[in-house]
C-alpha cells in the first residue's frame, strides 16, 4: 500500500494540521478516539507526526466484515492444509456455500472505526523496531511512515498483528544484528527475504474474488501473487524493514 501517494506527510505544525482536521471531521463519533492518540503523543514529536500521517490517510481505507468472510477464508484454510488442486477446492466450496460476493459483506471505514487502543498498539510496535533495530537509524522518517508504519495493506479486517509477527520473524535477523553490516537495511532485508523464500508455498491463480486476507496469509502460504506480496510486506514491516 502506498500511503504517501494518497496524502503527503505533514509536519503537523500549528496543532495537527489541516489534513488531519479534515479527516477528523469525517470520523463522526470516532473523532474522540483519534484525538486521544494525538493527545497521548503530544510530547513525542516523531510519534505525533506518525499519528498525523495515519489519521490523514484513514479516510481512504476500510474493510469488509460479515459471515460470508468465513467462507472466503475457508478456501485458504483448506488449500493450505491439504495442498489440493485449487480449482477443485474453489468449486467444492461454491457448491456447498454458494458463490462468494463482496455484496454479502458490510464495508466499514477506518476513520469511523479505528479506536485509540488499536492505534497506540500499532504505533508502539512500529516505533519499537524503528528505535531498537540497528538499521532503523538508516531508514528515513518519510520511508518509515510510507512503508513500515501502516497498520494495513489493503481492505483486510483490522487486527493487532505486529507483536506476533515480530516474535516470529525477528529471530531470523539475529545474525544481521551482530554483523558489521548491521546498520544496513538492505543487508537485513536480503537475509529476511532469503529465509522467507525457502518456505514451501502453493501458488495458484485460482482465487475467489475478495478482499485481502490479512496477516493470516503468513500461515496459509497459499494463493495468488497478491497474497505472497502481502506475506512479505507483513514480515518486513514487523521487523522494521
Model regions: which residues?
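Bacterial N-terminal signal peptides
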Residues: 1-8
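Active-site neighborhood of thiol-dependent amide/isopeptide-bond enzymes
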Residues: 176-241
Amino acid at each position: 500500500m502506498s500511503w504517501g501517494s494518497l496524502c503527503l506527510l505533514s509536519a503537523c505544525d500549528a496543532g495537527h494540521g489541516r489534513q488531519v482536521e479534515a479527516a477528523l471531521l469525517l470520523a463522526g463519533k470516532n473523532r474522540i478516539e483519534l484525538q486521544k492518540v494525538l493527545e497521548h503523543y503530544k510530547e513525542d514529536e516523531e510519534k505525533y507526526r506518525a499519528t498525523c500521517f495515519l489519521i490523514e490517510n484513514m479516510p481512504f481505507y476500510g474493510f469488509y466484515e460479515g459471515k460470508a468472510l468465513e467462507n472466503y477464508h475457508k478456501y485458504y484454510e483448506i488449500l493450505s492444509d491439504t495442498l489440493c488442486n485449487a480449482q477443485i477446492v474453489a468449486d467444492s466450496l461454491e457448491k456447498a456455500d454458494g458463490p462468494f460476493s463482496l455484496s454479502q459483506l458490510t464495508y466499514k471505514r477506518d476513520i469511523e472505526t479505528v479506536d485509540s487502543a488499536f492505534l497506540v498498539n500499532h504505533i508502539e510496535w512500529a516505533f519499537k523496531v524503528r528505535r531498537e533495530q540497528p538499521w532503523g537509524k538508516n531508514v528515513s522518517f518519510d520511508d518509515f511512515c510510507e512503508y513500515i508504519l501502516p497498520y494495513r495493506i489493503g481492505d483486510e479486517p483490522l487486527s493487532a498483528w505486529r507483536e506476533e509477527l515480530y516474535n516470529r520473524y525477528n529471530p531470523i535477523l539475529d545474525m544481521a544484528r551482530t554483523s558489521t553490516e548491521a546498520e544496513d537495511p538492505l543487508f537485513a532485508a536480503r537475509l529476511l527475504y532469503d529465509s522467507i523464500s525457502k518456505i514451501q508455498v502453493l501458488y495458484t491463480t485460482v482465487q475467489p474474488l475478495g478482499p485481502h486476507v490479512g496477516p493470516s496469509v503468513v500461515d496459509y502460504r497459499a494463493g495468488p501473487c497478491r497474497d505472497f506480496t502481502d506475506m512479505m510486506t507483513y514480515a518486513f514491516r514487523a521487523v522494521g524493514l
